Amino acid sequence: MSVSGLKAELKFLASIFDKNHERFRIVSWKLDELHCQFLVPQQGSPHSLPPPLTLHCNITESYPSSSPIWFVDSEDPNLTSVLERLEDTKNNNLLRQQLKWLICELCSLYNLPKHLDVEMLDQPLPTGQNGTTEEVTSEEEEEEEEMAEDIEDLDHYEMKEEEPISGKKSEDEGIEKENLAILEKIRKTQRQDHLNGAVSGSVQASDRLMKELRDIYRSQSYKTGIYSVELINDSLYDWHVKLQKVDPDSPLHSDLQILKEKEGIEYILLNFSFKDNFPFDPPFVRVVLPVLSGGYVLGGGALCMELLTKQGWSSAYSIESVIMQINATLVKGKARVQFGANKNQYNLARAQQSYNSIVQIHEKNGWYTPPKEDG
């Protein structure tokens, strides 16, 4: 689809579901992203509204050949199920039809009547006064030509004048040049793999992981060195994460200082591996080094954390929030470095075995949820 065609479609959607719509609102949009809200009346009080349900949509570079990717800021399994069914619905990749299906499903989920405005999504895109499609300015034509020459730059593309919220920052703003170069390298590699018929992963997972990586590169926690991220063999699905700063008052912090003096290592190295169905399944996370005791670290380096299981995972979780939660959990669980321990005891096969065993136990007996004051 051309840039002007995509813009016309997004404008059409935003004109129907504007920021004041009673049921579904498109709060902001760009050529590769939609931020939406679904409003659910409070039970027994139609005039009292709980916080709206927030949905995000990533529009891929190959749209409409490939489907947009939807995810939701909620841990409700019913909502996750709705999005999974949408992912399985391959009949129509057009945003208009996906939006219609999604709104109808959400209305059904919350026992609400189907909103009449969804029928407007079946209409063709509006035409100009002379019966032609909206006129494209020479400036837009020039932009479209640039897009055709270098389509992988779509992630950088921004039309500030079309955005409902003025002053919206570019998705690459706040990212250092060396990290932008990494993102660009990934995009070019993915494009080349696609041309060579050697695509790895899924469009859904790759788009979400690119978004996660951009958010990390932009975050203050990353920039201040609390943690770092490195892609293993340039793979978007295999990360090394270094926890470089932990609570300075913790025994773990003291151990890391000693480890630095002895071995020149002052961090905890984690491995994050992602599957094709991310973000609907959690990443598999394990400690690579150093060998730790306590801190909910299992044999092989796996982590005993509910949020890293299907039972406790939500597609709305960001990877940075997972990293920071692991950091806090290690400290809270009184993790200590095992100096002189056999480093070979941490490996992927053993970690997966420990993880599977602990998941089976907790599926039968449940998980312990600490009081809120314990974090």
Swiss-Prot record:
<protein>
    <recommendedName>
        <fullName>Ubiquitin-conjugating enzyme E2 Q2</fullName>
        <ecNumber>2.3.2.23</ecNumber>
    </recommendedName>
</protein>
<dbReference type="GO" id="GO:0005524">
    <property type="term" value="F:ATP binding"/>
</dbReference>
<dbReference type="GO" id="GO:0070936">
    <property type="term" value="P:protein K48-linked ubiquitination"/>
</dbReference>
<feature type="compositionally biased region" description="Acidic residues">
    <location>
        <begin position="136"/>
        <end position="153"/>
    </location>
</feature>
<keyword id="KW-0808">Transferase</keyword>
<keyword id="KW-0833">Ubl conjugation pathway</keyword>
<comment type="function">
    <text>Accepts ubiquitin from the E1 complex and catalyzes its covalent attachment to other proteins. In vitro catalyzes 'Lys-48'-linked polyubiquitination.</text>
</comment>
<dbReference type="InterPro" id="IPR016135">
    <property type="entry name" value="UBQ-conjugating_enzyme/RWD"/>
</dbReference>
<dbReference type="GO" id="GO:0005829">
    <property type="term" value="C:cytosol"/>
</dbReference>
<feature type="active site" description="Glycyl thioester intermediate">
    <location>
        <position position="304"/>
    </location>
</feature>
<dbReference type="GO" id="GO:0005634">
    <property type="term" value="C:nucleus"/>
</dbReference>
<feature type="region of interest" description="Disordered">
    <location>
        <begin position="123"/>
        <end position="174"/>
    </location>
</feature>
<dbReference type="GO" id="GO:0004842">
    <property type="term" value="F:ubiquitin-protein transferase activity"/>
</dbReference>
<comment type="pathway">
    <text>Protein modification; protein ubiquitination.</text>
</comment>
<keyword id="KW-0832">Ubl conjugation</keyword>
<keyword id="KW-0547">Nucleotide-binding</keyword>
<keyword id="KW-0067">ATP-binding</keyword>
<dbReference type="Pfam" id="PF00179">
    <property type="entry name" value="UQ_con"/>
</dbReference>
<dbReference type="InterPro" id="IPR000608">
    <property type="entry name" value="UBQ-conjugat_E2_core"/>
</dbReference>
<feature type="domain" description="UBC core">
    <location>
        <begin position="204"/>
        <end position="368"/>
    </location>
</feature>
<keyword id="KW-0963">Cytoplasm</keyword>
<dbReference type="Pfam" id="PF05773">
    <property type="entry name" value="RWD"/>
</dbReference>
<feature type="compositionally biased region" description="Basic and acidic residues">
    <location>
        <begin position="154"/>
        <end position="174"/>
    </location>
</feature>
<dbReference type="InterPro" id="IPR006575">
    <property type="entry name" value="RWD_dom"/>
</dbReference>
<dbReference type="InterPro" id="IPR050113">
    <property type="entry name" value="Ub_conjugating_enzyme"/>
</dbReference>
<comment type="similarity">
    <text>Belongs to the ubiquitin-conjugating enzyme family.</text>
</comment>
<dbReference type="GO" id="GO:0061631">
    <property type="term" value="F:ubiquitin conjugating enzyme activity"/>
</dbReference>
